[in-house]
């Protein structure tokens, strides 16, 4: 799935359903990015962020050839050559890194045969967060952190929101259509929640510093309530209003 990170959320725009186990291959990933470029333009790509499974020689080379900045996490046991030309696990280049310490490696490292900049952040319990990129950027970890928004999206599509997995659909065509409906519903719910938070009732911040309810859940609860009124009470004014706020003429409503 390819998503755009915007205002703390990931907006799903393109996806491929895989009739296989595991992750997408390089051809499938490139097809998604090409589709984005064809519709929105390459200049709209600020950075591509991805997890550890999305690496490879052809993939990295294609991103470089098309001048697409990337910040991609890599596995700590990935084999690389150290300064002496010896093959080691990449974590050995950062063996003395302390928790909370951030280091940008001094030279490019060949990853799958392609030179990349590598940055490392020491985490708790001797873990490492390793990010490969094709440009030097002091904010590489800030960029990579936005990848978490797609995990939030998945949780909204699944247990926290639409229970996508509980449909038990197996036919790819039906799953594809359902995912499209869920993507639209997610955007609608989030937009309604945003609209309410900004114009009607700002969130209360609890003692632990978190909002009392997520923007998505606020919008979803509002949509559910409106649909119940429409179907059970034949009262459609609220759902009609929620449809109207999808337009750009928000100020004229109310």
Predicted segments with their positions:
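Single, function-defining residue in the core of a domain
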Residues: 4-254
């Amino acid at each position: 799935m390819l998503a755009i990170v915007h205002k703390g959320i990931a907006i799903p725009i393109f996806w491929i359903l895989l009739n296989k186990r595991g992750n997408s291959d390089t051809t499938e990933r490139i097809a998604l990015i090409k589709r984005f470029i064809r519709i929105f333009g390459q200049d709209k790509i600020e950075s591509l962020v991805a997890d550890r499974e999305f690496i490879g020689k052809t993939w990295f080379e294609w991103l470089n050839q098309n001048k697409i900045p990337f910040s991609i996490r890599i596995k700590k046991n990935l084999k690389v050559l150290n300064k002496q030309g010896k093959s080691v696990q990449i974590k050995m280049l950062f063996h003395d890194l302390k928790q909370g310490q951030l280091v940008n490696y001094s030279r490019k490292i060949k990853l799958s045969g392609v030179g990349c900049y590598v940055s490392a952040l020491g985490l708790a319990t001797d873990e490492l967060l390793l990010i490969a990129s094709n440009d030097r950027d002091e904010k590489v970890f800030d960029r990579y952190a936005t990848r978490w928004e797609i995990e939030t999206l998945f949780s909204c599509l699944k247990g926290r929101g639409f229970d996508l997995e509980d449909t038990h659909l197996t036919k790819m065509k039906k799953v594809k259509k359902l995912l499209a409906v869920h993507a639209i519903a997610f955007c609608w719910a989030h937009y309604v929640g945003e609209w309410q938070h900004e114009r009607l009732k700002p969130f209360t911040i609890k003692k632990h510093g978190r909002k009392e309810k997520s923007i998505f859940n606020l919008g979803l609860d509002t949509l559910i309530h409106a649909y119940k009124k429409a179907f059970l009470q034949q009262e459609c004014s609220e759902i009609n209003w929620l449809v109207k706020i999808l337009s750009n003429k928000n100020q004229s409503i109310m």
